[in-house]
Every structure is written in structure tokens, then in C-alpha cells.
Amino acid sequence: MKKYPKIGIRPTIDGRQGGVRESLEEKTMNLAKAVAELITSNLKNGDGTPVECVIADGTIGRVAESAACAEKFEREGVGATITVTSCWCYGAETMDMNPYYPKAVWGFNGTERPGAVYLAAVLAGHAQKGLPAFGIYGRDVQDLNDNSIPADVAEKILRFARAAQAVATMRGKSYLSMGSVSMGIAGSIVNPDFFQEYLGMRNESIDLTEIIRRMAEGIYDKEEYAKAMAWTEKYCKKNEGNDFNIPEKTKTRAQKDEDWEFIVKMTIIMRDLMQGNPKLKELGFKEEALGHNAIAAGFQGQRQWTDFYPNGDFSEALLNTSFDWNGIREAFVVATENDACNGVAMLFGHLLTNRAQIFSDVRTYWSPEAVKRVTGKELTGMAANGIIHLINSGATTLDGTGQQTNANGEPAMKPCWEITEGEVEKCLEATTWYPANRDYFRGGGFSSNFLSKGGMPVTMMRLNLIKGLGPVLQIAEGWTVEIDPEIHKLLDERTDRTWPTTWFVPRLCDKPAFKDVYSVMNNWGANHGAISYGHIGQDVITLASMLRIPVCMHNVEEDQIFRPAAWNAFGMDKEGADYRACTTYGPIYK
């Protein structure tokens, strides 16, 4: 079982003994327990285990008790804190001073004791000391004996906790570059300063010859390989598509069979490189058994590898999927072309939702007029104002087929613990594996092809690094859409019929970048996007503020934005205030 960070709950109290403190002990501790129960009951880690909370041993009224709480949290592996109170407390004495923890304060809205006054006072202290904290204050007054958590308070607590757990989970992990820069793509020029200072992560790197060495020297689990090949024969190879290569570039059946064996070994080895494998230690490969402690990775592929060896499409697709030959499991995060910037956006989406993430080229904007000209048909329904073609070189998660269903029977991408064996088979059945286009991939291989079901709410994200500014984040909430099959066929075949397609329509609003579908495409900051199931823009914005990454483009309603209270001091324009606050505070780990 993986070890995850915990969330610390800090019940603070008026320190005046002799009647005041004693009258508040039970109430304050009950609020702390209610917050812990809320989080544990609603939030899960990537493997499906509940997010754990640690409550201070007692209420915190004076600085010695703050220090004792801090020591306990360090021992217990806490990665973020929520301070809870129903009364006045001594602000600077009782506040959380750990500079690395995301922190929030819930001040109970009651009349008998001034929880709101403490909230305001301690948030002022956090702002003055440069330790931003999220303020949580219920809209409606509660009675003193009411220990329930109002819906608006619960929403903010869970939004904070979800993002804070993501921050703490990635801290101390690695991003593994398998290979180096792919085709001059800026996102694959990996910036170690960004990872270290903003995410608290380290960068690991291997030359792709390491994969060949492990194949040649048998540094992989042979039993697992046999199991993996049998599974691949049953579920993937049987869905091998037509070979569209010209005759002189078409591989023989024997060569294709060798490619299947090669890419299955490659998948096992890439996974072992990321997380290690205790089986390798049993086989005598102690160093290789360790792995690189990678929570995310990227595979360069093009051009040096793919010009000579089978491409990484199968390996990337399977690793990014919530299942493989070992059964249903948490999806990995692996960026095509080692685009680390997109890999980070995928990591954000995965940690916030516990779902597999789609990696795609943001390939083409199709206007209604262009579609009519090319196909003779009109886009209708949600696609009527134009569509964005999200497509990748056969390396997209199979969860993206939309063959999983939610409680309402609608297409979905689900956390691994909700996925059924029947849904696994549907995802596999909906995927065709085409021999790779050898104009692009001279070494061959196989590319996944599917068409995502329409009607899924999704959020497209992208992290960009800007010289002189630093990282910025883009967010576009929208939906996958289904279009007329004849329109899809014509548009798909003039793009690449061997690759997976997701037709995307963003939610439009009065912001310039979202005035129409074309503007979303025109304002996108790079060639790739990370697509997560669900409208999670609010959570992404909260996470970005914790990491001091400004959001330059989003279509989230302003009243849904939840950032640290200190952001209010940087002006009433939320976008400008975000930039000013992130610049002022700078990265957490610098």
C-alpha cells in the first residue's frame, strides 16, 4: 500500500483559563472531528484509500500547544492543515507557521463567541507574515450547539483539502524524462528549477538505451511478460487494424508479431523505471528494482527512437489507462514526446480527480463553414458553433473511449475503484490498434484508435513557462461531443485515421478568449492539452494558487473561484490580483 500525506486538523481556542476555555473545549474539538469526518468520508487517494486526517492531541490556546501540534504533525506525515475554531483565539500564537503546508482556517459563524473575529485576525497575521491561508466563513449564523458543517463551508473545506492533498502528494516525488527533447518541442525542454521550486519535485532522466539494455539483458519479470503477452493477444492484437502503409513500407506478419512482443516488454520496463519493481530484486537486479520514485514521466520517442524502434504509443496508452494485464489499477501519468509541461497539467488533473488523463494535440479548429465546405453537411447540437479536434499519435488513455458509465448511465472516465471488468472489456473492444504510420514512425509499432463518446464534461488544461514571468496555467471547461458519423469519417481521414479522436467544445462566455470556439483554439498556449473528466476548473484554480501559478485563461464563474484570503489585498480584479499575488509570494520551495 502506498503511503500518502495526511491533513492536519488544528482546533484553536481562547486560551483564558478559569471559565472561558473550559466552556469551549468540547465545542471546538467537536468541530475538528466533524471536519476530519467530512474529509475522510468524501476524499480518496489515488489507490482508493480515504484521505486520512490527524487531529491535534488537544485544543490549541497558547504557543506551546501550537508547537506541540506542529511536532505531532511532522511525525504523522501531515502535508496540509485546516485550523478550526468557534471563538476568539490568539492569532499569531495559534496560527500554523509551517511555510510548506497549504493552510486554511474555518471560523465558525456564531454570535455567542466571535469565531469570525479570530478568522479575520489570523488571516491578517497570515498575510502580514507572508504565509497565505484560505479563509472559510459560513454565510449563515449557526447556534452554538450546532456542530454540523453547512453546505457552503463543506464545499470550501473539500475544495481546499482536495487541492492541498495534491500539493502534498507530489512534493518529494520525481518527474522521469525517458529520453530528452522531442522535435524541438519547448515543453520537452524540461526545466528543473520549475519542478524544484514550484512543485517540490526532483527531475530524473534516463537515456532510451536503458530500455534496450533491460530488454537485451532480461531485466524484467519474465512471468509478467508471459501474462502480458497472453492478455495483449486476447484483447489488443485481435483488434489489430488494417495496415495503411504503402507496400514497400509495410512490415511482414512476422515483423509485426515481433513489434507486439517488443512494445509489451517496453511497457513493463517503462513502468519499472518509474516506480521500481520488487520482483527485479528477487531476480538479482537490486539497483533496477528501485525505480526513480516518479509520480509522472515523459517518453521522447520522436525522432531518434521512433526512426529505428517501434513507437511508444502502446506503452503510453496502456500506462495512462486505469487497467492492464494485472487488472484494474490507478492510471500512471506519462507525457507523449516528453512534454513535461503537459505532463504536469496531466498530473494536476490526476491528483485532483484520481482519474486517467487524456493527452492530446490541440490539432484543429473546425468552423461550421469549413465543415460544410469539406463535407457538405452541417454541425448540429452542441457542435453547431464549431469543434476542436483533440487527437494524439495513438498514445491516449483507453479510458478516453467513454465506454465507462456513471450512476446515470452516461459516458464517463471513472476512478479505478469504480471501474468494472465489463467496462474494461468495452474500452478494449472500442480500441483498434493500427500498424503505425511509417512516414511518421519509421520503426513501426502500433497506434491506438478510438472515437471518444460525446456528452462527457471535461476540462482541458495546459501549463506554459513564460520567460520573465514563470509558469502560467490555462483552463477550458467544456464537453466531448458526437458529430454526424459521415462528418467524423471525412475529417478524421484527412487528419490521421490511425489515431484516437476526441471532439471538444468549450463552454463559451463573455471573456475574450471564450467568445467563440475559434478564440479558445487561437488563445491556447501550446500544441498539447491535458484533458480531465469533469468540470474541475475551480479545483485547478485553487491548486494553482497554492503553487503560486497564475491562471491566464479560464471560463470558470467568478463566484466559484477560491483562493487564499491574501489575494483580496491585491485588487478587485481577480485575474490581475492573481498575477500580483503569485509574483509577490513566489514559489513555495525557493
Curated annotation (Swiss-Prot):
It comes from the Bacteria. Mn(2+) binds at residues 337, 361, 528. The keyword Transmembrane does not apply. GO terms for cellular component: cytoplasm. The keyword Cytoplasm applies. It holds the Pfam family Fucose_iso_N1. It is found in: Cytoplasm. One of its GO terms (biological process) is D-arabinose catabolic process. The active site is at residues 337, 361. Disulfide bonds: none annotated. This is L-fucose isomerase. It comes from Bacteroides fragilis (strain YCH46). The gene is fucI.
